[in-house]
């Protein structure tokens, strides 16, 4: 009796197959469009960064799972302007209006941890719900004056 049940089960599994028949498809590219309008301005409190929220993936579909923006900074030493310095994560700005009908279009962050006479470079990446990051934005540079 057991061999008959096992054989019947195997026949059922073989007849069902595994998935839809057809040509294989490459996974969809679900990366947000790159932020291209990052700006940096000096304020009394530090350096203000502003940028626009991306609304689409690179393939043109509407962006639906944006959760935050990752801000990266590097400090350029006045004594070694050409030294290779890596970008370091500075902070994360959360997107809290994903379920709202009208979403925020512009974002702003003020970096208060800056020193006078230092040069800083910044870039921003969009972060999706799965933790993946977009390509970095345009790079902005600012020298903090006294």
Regions found by a protein language model. Name each.
Residues 14-17:
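C-terminal motif of bacterial Sec signal peptides marking the signal peptidase cleavage site
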Residues 1-7:
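Bacterial N-terminal signal peptides that target proteins for export
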Residues 126-130:
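Surface-exposed loop/turn motifs at beta-strand-loop junctions within extracellular Ig-like
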Residues 52-53, 63-117, 132-136:
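Recognizes extended acidic, P/S/T-rich segments that occur
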Residues 19-65, 116, 131-146:
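Pro/Thr/Ser/Gly-rich low-complexity, intrinsically disordered linker/stalk tracts
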Residues 9-12:
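Processing junctions and N-termini across compartments
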